[in-house]
């Protein structure tokens, strides 16, 4: 072993079919994806910035090679990938199941593996403002405005905003950066906090809408959208929006499924996803589906396990198949 690269002693016969993962959590969907890749016969390489992963190497037996690297330093990752190739590893895909890293992985995978993982669509989903722009003048958007700088009072008047409102940091996937405000003083406070936290970033301001909220997990292969699971979400209605419960719907009323699937397929096509996976969060408001958020990955946490228990589908494994150009089964 040398430097920060740790390799599990293992004899690999024939071509070393390799899959590179950019980032992971210790458990949950991103970790289960690595286990799925190992089951499929891949030599698994993990790029990580978490020192915890290196310190607890024995707990990552499904990771054959663990490389400590700055995941924001794309040139350094390129050099590491080239080194892996020089060692004889046949890299078939570079993937990530982690917020903010899916686009980087898709770009590197296209560059080194000639895969087609709809990187432009991923980029739109990782930026909430780009998502809204892609759905401009469609019924799936609620009223929204983009605050960059200047008087907040003038911004409210100019855009004819009425409370309550939702304030979002466009590049954050965390619920801590999605805030409900009921009055002008709260609005000014929340916007200023987000501007301090993300200097130079615009702020997305949306109309607050009521209605039941659903999370829809999808797989997209060669332009065909497959709805894998529909989950009704319980959302706290405090200032921060936190999911407090999931109800995976094993039986969905026909009219609900038909209207929801039409909306999901339309939205995914407008965003340009042709190959890959994404989950959408939608509300049904005044007889119309409204997109709350789109994310270019499977939900984290226990989602992969929930779907496997309910339907017998390992969604992370199916995503890996799409990443290497195979049809999901």
Feature map (PLM): residue ranges:
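A conserved helix-loop-beta module that forms one wall/lid of the active-site cleft
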Residues: 110-177
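ATP-binding N-terminal substructure of ATP-dependent carboxylate-amine bond-forming enzymes
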Residues: 11-121, 325-328
């Amino acid at each position: 072993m040398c430097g920060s690269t740790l390799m599990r002693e293992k004899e690999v016969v024939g071509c070393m079919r390799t899959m590179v993962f950019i980032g992971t959590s210790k458990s949950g969907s991103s970790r289960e994806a690595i286990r799925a890749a190992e089951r499929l016969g891949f030599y698994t390489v993990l790029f990580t910035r978490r020192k915890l992963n290196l310190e607890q190497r024995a707990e990552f037996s499904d990771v054959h090679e663990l490389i400590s690297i700055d995941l924001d330093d794309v040139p350094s990752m390129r050099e590491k990938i080239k080194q892996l190739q020089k060692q004889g590893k046949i890299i078939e895909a570079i993937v990530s199941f982690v917020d903010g890293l899916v686009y980087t992985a898709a770009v590197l995978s296209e560059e080194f593996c000639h895969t087609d993982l709809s990187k432009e669509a991923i980029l739109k989903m990782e930026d909430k403002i780009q998502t809204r722009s892609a759905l401009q003048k469609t019924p799936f958007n609620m009223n929204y405005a983009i605050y960059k700088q200047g008087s907040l009072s003038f911004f409210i008047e100019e855009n004819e905003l009425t409370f309550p409102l939702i304030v979002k940091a466009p590049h954050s996937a965390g619920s801590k950066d999605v805030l409900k405000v009921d009055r002008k003083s709260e609005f000014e406070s929340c916007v200023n906090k987000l501007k301090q936290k993300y200097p130079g970033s615009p702020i997305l301001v949306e109309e607050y809408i009521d209605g039941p909220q659903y999370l829809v997990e999808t797989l997209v292969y060669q332009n065909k959208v497959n709805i894998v699971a529909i989950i009704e979400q319980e959302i706290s209605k405090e200032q921060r929006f936190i999911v407090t419960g999931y109800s995976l719907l094993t039986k969905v009323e026909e009219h609900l499924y038909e209207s929801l699937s039409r909306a999901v397929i339309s939205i995914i096509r407008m965003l340009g996803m042709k190959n890959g996976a994404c989950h959408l969060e939608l509300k049904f408001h005044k007889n119309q589906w409204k997109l709350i958020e789109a994310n270019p990955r499977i939900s984290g946490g226990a989602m992969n396990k929930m779907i496997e228990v309910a339907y017998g589908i390992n969604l992370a494994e199916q995503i890996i198949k799409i990443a290497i150009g195979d049809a999901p089964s």
